[in-house]
Amino acid sequence: MKLLAVRRLLRIQSVVVRYRLDDLLFDQPLLPWWLRALGYLLPWRWLPRRRSEQPRAVRLRLALQDLGPIFIKFGQILSTRRDLLPEDIADELTWLQDRVPPFNPQQSVALIEEQLGARVDEAFARFDSEPLASASVAQVHAAQLKTGEEVVVKVVRPGLKAVIRQDLAWLYLFARLAERASTEARRLHLVDVVSDYEKTIYDELDLLREAANASQLKRNFEGSPLLYVPQIYWDWCRPKVLVMERIYGVPVTDLAALVDQGTDLKLLAERGVEIFFTQVFRDSFFHADMHPGNIFVSTRQPWDPQYIAIDCGIVGSLTPQDQDYLARNLLAFFKRDYRKVAQLHIDSGWVPADTQVNEFEAAIRTVCEPIFEKPLKDISFGQLLLRLFQTARRFNMEVQPQLVLLQKTLLNIEGLGRQLYPELDLWTTAKPFLERWMRKRMSPKAMLDNLQGQLEQLPHLAQMTRTALEDISRPAWDTRKRERHDHHLLRLLGAALLAGGVLLALQTPPTSANAWPSWLMLASGLYLLVGRRRLSD
């Protein structure tokens, strides 16, 4: 084992002892009873405790901060997994600050010049060596292009990949050991949690990916009064350097400044909710890191306020099927139709097909009824989704990364909205949007567009069906995947019948006595594509 890795392990161990995290580690059901009992023999467990010792959640947060940027980022990711963590720990981890000392400006300049293949004074009319901000992954410098535009230059912290690889190796080791020793750890899929983190952190290291995300989000809201996204200057973007328009706005948490400029806080809060649902249901592409540090408010027209979003390193998206099931789930909640909520979870494949609907419905009712007894303005949309996911986990709900990101984003938007306007009624804002979206989705135009999309797949239908059948026949194919493929095969069959019916109808007059096969194929195809879904409602 390399000396640096050993030193890092000793460093982690010393932090665990200093912050008495043995309480958190050895008192949890993640470890078997014999290992928890062994933990009580550790010498420092018998040392007297200070009266002023802080709660376990605070100690964990301080320890993660002490261990450095990679563990800070991991803690931030963990804070979104409220289905895994006790509430006090999840709440405390949201306070983790991703602020670290800046690295040497000379290193920053050298990296920029290496990436751009040009000297800084050749690329920019002005470059401020003193950074505007510094975080665990990158730091930001102000600059001006030769053409006069004010920009910011984001630079990835040098040497970060080596640190990430080392810390990830230890995180994977700890997660695997816990899963081998404990059924509870296996249920929580700790290795998968680390794997999700690995993907997130490496995605954030690729600034071209972040630039592409920002460009997509800007295009989605081009000309919108709701949201402004700074322009990306692609000629100066590289994997480790991003150049974008410099924005000037009021931090969304600076309520005093927003009030001073006469901002309509109620409208601002409602627009935050509208932005969220527009991203999720209209665009199926949402900014998944909308914490207050990444959101500003334009100083123009405070009576008609506009958000400004930066840092698009983490984004999420939903498939059309996930969009549909999510919208119908939320509308069923509005009606307190818990049986429909339970059935939708089964139909979507989020929980196993053999789940007892009656038992699942009863569990959902037990969680939701106390919440719905509150006034609508006091109900937390994000907390409701969280409680639902926690309940579904008891019924072996498979972790859906896209839904975890969505729930985290919703909690951020909802919390932000109620800081701006405590009387915000998120339900009143959301329900009309969802109903409009569902009506539009079931409109003749939408069905025609869907038919066109299915017809475009017709030349590939035979190969797609063959591939699906080969996959489903594999011994390792699990039940959940089999259910999803069954659903996919039925849609393929529906598309084939619909396309065949259309082609047959073009050759046979619809009033002819020989037209019945085309009508039968059209009706069967429509049933498989649309009717089955509506019947499940």
From Swiss-Prot:
Active site annotation, chain numbering: 289
- Sorted UniProt keywords: ATP-binding, Cell inner membrane, Cell membrane, Kinase, Membrane, Nucleotide-binding, Transferase, Transmembrane, Transmembrane helix, Ubiquinone biosynthesis
Entry keyword Ligase: no
The question of whether Transferase is a record keyword is answered with yes
> Per UniProt, where does ATP bind?
132-140, 154
| Gene Ontology biological-process entries | regulation of ubiquinone biosynthetic process; ubiquinone biosynthetic process
Localization of this protein: Cell inner membrane
State which residue ranges cross the membrane: 30-47, 489-507, 513-530
Q: Output the superkingdom of the source species.
A: Bacteria
Per the record, the similarity remark reads: Belongs to the ABC1 family. UbiB subfamily.
Q: Please explain the role this protein plays, according to its UniProt record.
A: Is probably a protein kinase regulator of UbiI activity which is involved in aerobic coenzyme Q (ubiquinone) biosynthesis.
Q: What is this protein called?
A: Probable protein kinase UbiB
Its encoding gene is what?
A: ubiB
